[in-house]
Amino acid sequence: MQTLQFLAAPAEAPGISGGQIFGAVTASGAALVAGTGLIIGLKGSDWGPLVINNKRRAAWWGIVTGTIWVAAGGTWAEIANGVGSVPPSLFAGGDFGNPGQGAIALFLTCCAFGPKWGSKTAPPAVIGLAAAVVYGTAGGVWGILVNVVRMLIGIVTGQR
């Protein structure tokens, strides 16, 4: 008597067809890569994506890195929230009144992109990190920016 054997199709291998364009990358992995890229870029790099040679690139790197850190959670979020808690605490309970998170977000954006920082790229990057945290709590157009970055991270990590 002969028996019929069914062979199952192999499981789909991770990769582009599996939705993870860089292989297995988690939110914590994305946070590690973003933080490393920010530090290397600020120290000086000649590789295109990591070249941070002006305030605009430094601020954007800070904003995106801070958003990724918050999305990753854990220690990454604690670092970002620590940096991001400084600007709101300067205005809390003082003689300045309560400007609101939206105004603080606008203030940080002006501070990161407005002044002539010269060759200094660290200040706008740190302000960008703080702004990312405030953007997440401010809502409005600031929340849209944060959600776009988080959606892109979800696509890269395969966690849609």
Language-model segments: residues:
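Short, strongly hydrophobic alpha-helical membrane anchors
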Residues: M1-Q20, T157-R160
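Interfacial loop-to-helix junctions that mark the boundaries of transmembrane helices
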Residues: P14-T26, I52-N53, P88-N98
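N-terminal signal-anchor/start-transfer transmembrane helix
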Residues: G23-P49
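Alpha-helical transmembrane segments and their helix-start/interface "positive-inside/aromatic belt" motifs
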Residues: S45-G62, W117-I127
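A generic, lipid-embedded transmembrane alpha helix
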Residues: A58-I79
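Aromatic-anchored segments of alpha-helical transmembrane domains
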Residues: I68-A71, A130-G140
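Alpha-helical transmembrane-segment detector that highlights a single hydrophobic TM helix
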Residues: A80-L108
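Juxtamembrane boundary at the C-terminal end of a transmembrane helix
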Residues: G139-R160
